[in-house]
């Protein structure tokens, strides 16, 4: 079933709630949009973006609760970026940054919750032509932060 914008916006807001306190609100978009992009390309599996082995959102889901989740998320994003000539584009947010995401169990819990939020979304369902999910998400975040 196609995702409703209200469901997308609710998930975006929920993910921002998880990030509160560790960083300036203007930086939320870096993390939220990166995860949304990873989820989107993993769900869509179209020919424009290659999702390499070890570079999918499902690989992130498998990390929930892992002590090294931040570093491993960075590596997963790096694999997708490298496979698609997107280095320096989608790999800017550091998911292992203790000053922004906390350390130890705090980081582990925060990132596990973030991944779980996006895991609930089905972005692969058919939508009407011209529906720009990523653009809508970006505009939503810009309006609120």
Question: Language-model features: where?
Answer:
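Non-catalytic, mostly N-terminal accessory regions of nucleic-acid modification and defense proteins
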Residues: 1-145
